[in-house]
């Protein structure tokens, strides 16, 4: 059986690892947006006005895809930043509390 103290352990290395994963996923979201960018324009150029309605629909999809990708990128970067701040604050608080305990009992 795990003790209550096991549930209260914060590992800053794990928070930093999660932050790195979210930064990588943010980069993937940007890459996906870049891959689809200009698709509607390319189809319009190659197929002309014959496919105008399809091109308009494709442009709407491309815009929605770009907006979602930008949101995922921003969210991933913001979450990574917050995780790194939390890890740093935990380490700082741990050091301060350790110093206080040492000075009180040392």
Swiss-Prot record:
Any GO BP annotation: protein secretion
Sequence similarity: Belongs to the EspC family.
Source species: Mycobacterium leprae (strain TN)
Pfam families: T7SS_ESX_EspC (PF10824)
The protein, known as: EspC protein homolog
InterPro entries: EspC
